[in-house]
Amino acid sequence: MWFGEFGGQYVPETLIEPLKELEKAYKRFKDDEEFNRQLNYYLKTWAGRPTPLYYAKRLTEKIGGAKIYLKREDLVHGGAHKTNNAIGQALLAKFMGKTRLIAETGAGQHGVATAMAGALLGMKVDIYMGAEDVERQKMNVFRMKLLGANVIPVNSGSRTLKDAINEALRDWVATFEYTHYLIGSVVGPHPYPTIVRDFQSVIGREAKAQILEAEGQLPDVIVACVGGGSNAMGIFYPFVNDKKVKLVGVEAGGKGLESGKHSASLNAGQVGVFHGMLSYFLQDEEGQIKPTHSIAPGLDYPGVGPEHAYLKKIQRAEYVTVTDEEALKAFHELSRTEGIIPALESAHAVAYAMKLAKEMSRDEIIIVNLSGRGDKDLDIVLKVSGNV
């Protein structure tokens, strides 16, 4: 329920029952043999796990410092780590006897992952999306519809992600007997941050075995980008007790912290309550949630998962920022040096790893969680960079 003082269940009375039911079901099925057999089967044959741990030799040589390894979550079916959690929760919902999935989505990635998992398991899928985002993300809307999902534009409020979340919650309260609300990151009220972390920690478990096989030792540093924080939590969690491994989360510095145009909740936010949890949020003096900015649509979230807030507080993980400009540079660098086009989100982690590697010795090791591929971002990069 709590990560130190962070997390909790700050929700209206009407949500207590569905959350209790979910917690009970998760406790029951998470170690269930048949549930895990099916989950592992789908992760392997449908999602393409395990993903490789790749030594970025040319990038390493170019920088001339620590060895850089990439955990290739960009190779998961669907193109990002989101699939790990979507299939996990969808299968859990199926085991609970639910027939319908709902989710909210901003940039559309989580909506697509939910639609994919729903199609795989034969479940009805409704996706809430701010009307403004529906306009901005036409391809992902089309993708969701192709996968059989129904996309519901939300016209209230700022017509963006936070309004979509409100609508999804309203729906869930009224329909939870047959509906599962599939949250896409390590955020929201308990038990969601724990459930999502557990389904994502397959990343870190694989990476640990793979680096031991490749190098015979654990890495010195693990670097991952942090929006809500699920890809980072997924790779961090299996290493939390390995105190020698430094964990670094990279937030979206946008146009710089002083500009106010960023999404760096842990670096520039305050502790508050939003989305059913106590964590760090970007808020003004009145406690209102501030608008966020990042070149990477998936980092554009005004808060962060409570377990990250806790890891920061106990100083087990360090959180830094990378600007739009630095991320773009890394996006081009990785594409040209290794033949891998990263998502702009992941490019934030690559940028910081490149900076860090320079200051480290050649026998040290960095693992970067390459959380997604960059196909979805080509439009953005084209607009910003003009011709390459």
Swiss-Prot record:
What keywords sit in the KW lines? Amino-acid biosynthesis, Aromatic amino acid biosynthesis, Lyase, Pyridoxal phosphate, Tryptophan biosynthesis
Cofactor dependence: pyridoxal 5'-phosphate
Annotated Gene Ontology cellular component terms:
cytoplasm
Q: Which PROSITE patterns does this entry report, sorted A to Z? A: TRP_SYNTHASE_BETA (PS00168)
N6-(pyridoxal phosphate)lysine: residues carrying this PTM:
82
Kindly give the InterPro entries that the UniProt entry links to this protein: Trp_synth_b_CS, Trp_synth_beta, Trp_synth_beta/beta-like, TrpB-like_PALP, TrpB-like_PALP_sf
The catalytic activity, as recorded, is: (1S,2R)-1-C-(indol-3-yl)glycerol 3-phosphate + L-serine = D-glyceraldehyde 3-phosphate + L-tryptophan + H2O
From the UniProt record, give the pathway where this protein acts: Amino-acid biosynthesis; L-tryptophan biosynthesis; L-tryptophan from chorismate: step 5/5
| Membrane-spanning ranges | none
Cystine crosslinks = none
| Known EC number | 4.2.1.20
Q: Which GO terms describe its molecular function?
A: tryptophan synthase activity
PANTHER family given in the database record: TRYPTOPHAN SYNTHASE, TRYPTOPHAN SYNTHASE-RELATED
Q: How does it assemble?
A: Tetramer of two alpha and two beta chains.
- What does the sequence similarity comment in the record state about its family? Belongs to the TrpB family.
Purpose: The beta subunit is responsible for the synthesis of L-tryptophan from indole and L-serine.
Checking HAMAP family in the record gives: Trp_synth_beta
Q: Which NCBIfam families does the UniProt entry name for this protein?
A: trpB (TIGR00263)
Please report the name of this protein according to its UniProt entry.
Tryptophan synthase beta chain 1
